[in-house]
Amino acid sequence: MPTMKVVDMAGKEVGKIKLSDDVFGQEVRSDILHTAVRAYLLNQRQGTQSTRTRTEVSGGGKKPWRQKGTGHARQGSTRAPQWTHGGVALGPKPRSYRVNLDKRTKRAALISALSGKCAAKELVIVDAIKLDDYSTKTMVGMFAAVEAEKKPMLVLDSIDERVIKSCANVPGAKVSHFFGSENEVGEKVVCSDVNVYDILNSGKLILTRAAAEKIQEVYGK
């Protein structure tokens, strides 16, 4: 069970945290990561692209010339694919690209991504992130203090509009959330928009202490 230092927004060490091997110390499975990233990217597609076939373009109802005796190749319509302004052969049509992953694969992919960040020393644990006002300068300073200027990904333990909007003008910065809550019938649920693609596409992954503890609670054995 690795132990990581916990820093404040100025990058100074303020404590330690024990990370579970079940979440941050597993083997990095590139095959599962590939499956998860492919599914995520496919699910972002709208699938609305469309082309017209020869039956959908206007015109072409008349045979351009008689079948034999002209010296030309025989043609039945000026809207066949080989003609200018003709229909498209085998073109795309609207369809769903959605790929569904089972819970076991999603869980394994997220654990693998987190373990990879930890092994690459691209994981930072921050005690808490509090802003008194909207301040992009403060967030840029925090990213610099933890050496995460390039494409940082921040995972908060609550929805904080000040932090979200303060990071909006930071190039490449991504803000996600992972915390526990209750639904309308009082059941405990996990609220999260953390995904494997964002983790792999980021530079350093910055977790608040509470978010890291909740992730270990949910995904630890």
What is each of the regions a protein language model found here?
Residues L33-K68:
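A short, flexible low-complexity segment enriched in Lys/Arg and Gly/Pro that occurs
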Residues Q26, Q44-Q49, Q67, Q75, ...:
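Residue-identity detector for glutamine
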Residues R54-L90:
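Glycine/serine-rich anion-binding loops at beta->alpha junctions
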